[in-house]
Amino acid sequence: MKLLTLLLISISFYACTQTSTTLKVKTPTELILDHAKWQLTQDVNYDGSYRKIDYPNGDVPANIGVCTDVIIRSYRSAGVDMQVLIYEDVKNDLSYYYPIHYKRGTAKVDPNIDHRRVHIIRKFLDKNYPDTKLKSTDEYKPGDIIIWGNWHVGILIDEKVPGTDRYYGVHNIGAGPEKSDFYYDEEELDHYRWKPF
């Protein structure tokens, strides 16, 4: 009995002397940034061809993608399924998303492609999250979505362009995911801080 008591005391003492390790739970924004940066390590061919995909949580094959797929995949890593959010909104407001086709009676919702179109993402953010649109480039922060016109989109990460206070962005402009300085044409940029979590 004395041996057992001595053993338990020794184990308790040893356990008390060890430094405690706490696991840090990542925020959704940290998950998004980690996934955007992880995409830089992947071999992805630029391919915007139409493909049937699952719904919900559908994605084109991991080895292909376009600029919107960088955003969609990054947000999905934090539990945000843009495919579902955008599909449901487009389905309920075709006249907003496709005004010309709506007038002609040819508008239709498509869960395979709508969320992969830059102009649809822009309209979705403007309509449902107008307070997320920011004006000044001084306000840019990691996790912000940057949209050029209706043709291109990327996301800022937590790495700065050397010698500046500007954050790099991740996008796919034709050669797979890449890290770039996004501030080359500020007049065309729209800037969103979208945190739907």
Which residue stretches match the model-derived regions?
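...with weaker cross-activation on analogous glycine-rich loops/strands in unrelated enzymes
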Residues: L33, K91-A175
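A structural signal for short, hydrophobic beta-strand segments that form beta-sheets
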Residues: Q83, L156, E187-D190
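C-terminal motif of bacterial Sec signal peptides marking the signal peptidase cleavage site
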Residues: Y14-A15
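Sec-dependent signal peptide recognition
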Residues: M1-L8
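A generic structural signal for short, solvent-exposed coil/turn residues
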Residues: L8, I146-W148, V161, Y183-E186
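N-terminal capping segments
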Residues: T19-F124
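Low-complexity, Gly/Ser/Thr/Pro-rich intrinsically disordered linker/tail segments
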Residues: T164-F197
